[in-house]
Amino acid sequence: MLVYQELCIDTCAFGVNGESALARKKKIRPQDLKDVRVLCGTYEYMEASFEEMLKDTGAKMQDLHTEYNLESMVQAKFQESLLVFHSHWENCYSHILKVLPSHIIAGSVGVIMRKGEEKRLEDLVNEIQKAV
């Protein structure tokens, strides 16, 4: 039997063209997204879709119907669009886009493992924390 073990709760981050007005902000608030076009990748394994996470912001959501790739980053860089992603993936996008954090909850990050392996995972996490 497999079980899901949550490791942390993540937040949304947004990739933006460094010249855009939003790029001057330190952190994106939900009200900053009103009438702003937000590009959303499709990831079947996510707890909730980006559209669901941002549904109350008034953003103009554009579902890309695929996972992000270079084309989606270029689209955000050269158009007035934001690219939304989990903040833990910031390093994947920061070389092309200015990345802005938010307090918008993106859901949990965790692992799927065999039931009964929780102690082994705890030991692994402790070793990683010591190394960092």
Regions of interest found by a model, annotated:
Residues 8, 34, 55, 74-78, ...:
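Alpha-helix boundary recognition
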Residues 1-5, 10, 71-119:
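Beta-alpha-beta core module
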Residues 36-58, 121:
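Secondary-structure junction motif
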Residues 40-41, 59-70:
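Short beta-strand-to-loop elements that line the ligand-binding cleft
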Residues 2-12, 16-38, 122:
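Flexible hinge/capping segments at coil-to-helix
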Residues 18, 31-34, 105-132:
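Extended ligand-binding regions for polar small-molecule ligands
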Residues 4, 30, 50-54, 72-74, ...:
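Short amphipathic alpha-helical segments and helix-helix/interface helices
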